[in-house]
Amino acid sequence: MLKPTFIAHRGYAASFPENTLIALEAAREAGAEYIEVDVQLSKDLVPVLFHDRDLQRLCQQQGVIHDYTFDELKTFNVTDVEKFSDIYIANKIASLQEFIDYLKVNSGLKAFIELKRLMIDHFGEKKVLEIVLPMFSGMEQQICFISYNQSVLKKIHGSSQFATGIVVDKWSEYNTNTGWESEWLFCSVEGLPENNKALAIKPKLAVFEVGNIGLAKHLLAKGICHLETFRIKEMLQAFSKGGTGTKT
């Protein structure tokens, strides 16, 4: 069986509020070498780590990230009360700069930075790239930008040394006739083709969301070894002895 490479999906999101510094640190402490985060822009153009299209699930607030200034967002708590009750009541939204500072201290970590479609649709590709790309100057070996928006990735690919990764929910959304090729392709496990077509592509294939050991073993048996998971600690522990996945 192949040795798996696990990517911490929004940090250790199974046990901590996703995309927060405590979730990212918990993933690193668990042994993660690869982490993935989501980026959106505040009303006053400050990049923050946040996944959802609205603030309700994670912060119990109305509206979307770009409805608020960064100072306003910092007054909200990222609690995910449905999952964690009030355990993390004082947990704050992290800025992208805080995450970059964290990566510079933990230079062994590799990060996938997802540029969210909502942000790109609202502010435009040009503005997003003008703000975000310079923040990662000198970190080209540590960072890969990913997105469902292939146009913005093509611009990154053509203007910088950063790796890129296309994200799709269905295999049919992956278009190979674009005149360029990303280094990575992220595909949902439900969207994988039934045949071995997924193994024939040039980009490295990463699959999400791999939430249990049985699924991880199934994908490994098919030759897919880059697995994105909310349960980074459990997965790393399960495959820590020769990649056998013997723990539950």
Residue ranges and their predicted role:
Residues 1-248:
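Phosphate-group recognition and catalysis centered on beta-loop-alpha active-site segments
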